[in-house]
């Protein structure tokens, strides 16, 4: 069973976020059900929606939300979810986070695992 707690816009009801978090926690702890939330509902009508959505998603994940209705192409929201996975112990040893955000090391460049930019290849051969 999956329950959608129907998140209300925070701009219309200031307690919408905290009410959603309380309900998500109760659904998970008391009933053991999975929850799904529409990420953009909370930010409806407000500027900088992706920042609000990302923060909501991270906080909802921390309270027990198991899935979200969202656009995975919104980088700020995906980063917030990945950060929540790190903070909640879902991404063990930060493996996904490091794969996504760690830059190339001198060893990977030297070994050819990272391709040099085209301009640099022409100059060096």
Pin down the residues of each PLM region.
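Catalytic alpha/beta core domains of metabolic enzymes, predominantly
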Residues: 1-110
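Terminal or standalone catalytic/regulatory effector modules within metabolic enzymes
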Residues: 111-125
């Amino acid at each position: 069973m999956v329950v959608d707690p129907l998140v209300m816009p925070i701009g219309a009801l200031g307690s919408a976020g905290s009410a959603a978090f309380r309900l998500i926690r109760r659904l998970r702890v008391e009933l053991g059900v999975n929850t799904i939330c529409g990420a953009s509902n909370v930010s409806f009508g407000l500027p900088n929606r992706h920042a609000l959505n990302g923060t909501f998603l991270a906080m909802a994940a921390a309270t027990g939300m198991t899935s979200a209705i969202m656009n995975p192409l919104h980088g700020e929201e995906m980063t917030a979810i990945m950060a929540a996975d790190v903070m909640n112990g879902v991404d063990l040893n930060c493996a996904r986070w490091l794969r996504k955000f760690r830059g190339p090391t001198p060893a990977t460049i030297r070994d050819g695992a990272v391709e040099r930019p085209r301009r640099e290849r022409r100059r060096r051969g």
